C-alpha cells in the first residue's frame, strides 16, 4: 500500500489496482471485499452444523483485515444459535507455517470445538489437515478449498479476487477504468460460500436452506 501511494503520483498516466487496501489517487482502483459478510455465512453454517456447540477460529496475522473475518464469523454463529460458544481466536503469527496452523487447530479441537474456520493463508492448510486427523470440520478461505480434504472442509468462504481483477482489466481494455474504491460484497457476488459438494449430506437440506435465506 505504501509503495503504491509513493509510486502512483509519479506515473499519472499509468493505471494501477490494489487488492485489500485503499489508495486515494486519480489513477488507482482499490478492490475491496466485505469479508465479514462471507464470514457471517460461514459462522452461521458452522453453528447449525456443530454438535458440540463450540467453534474455533485461526487467523494468520492479528491485523484489521483478519479481524473482519473473525468478527463476521462470530456474529454469524451467534445469530444462528446464541448458545454457541466461539472459543478465543488463535493466531499463527505468519501466513506460511502449516505446522503452526495445525497446532492451533488441534488446541481448539482439544477444547471442544468441532468446526474451525481459518483465515491464515497457507498456514490454514495445517488447520484442514488437523480437521481430517481429528475427524472434525475446517472451513476454508479465499478460494474453494473443499477438495483439499474431501468431506472435512465444511465449506469455504470464497473471495472473488479473480473476478475483481478480470473486471478491472476488462474495464481498462474498454476505456472504462475508474479510480476509487470498488467494493465487492455478498450482493455483488464478491464473497460467498462454496458449493459444499462433499459435505451437503452431512449438513442436511434444512440447514442449507437456512443459510440460503
Language-model region placement:
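A residue-level marker of the well-folded mature domains of exported/periplasmic proteins
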Residues: 1-213
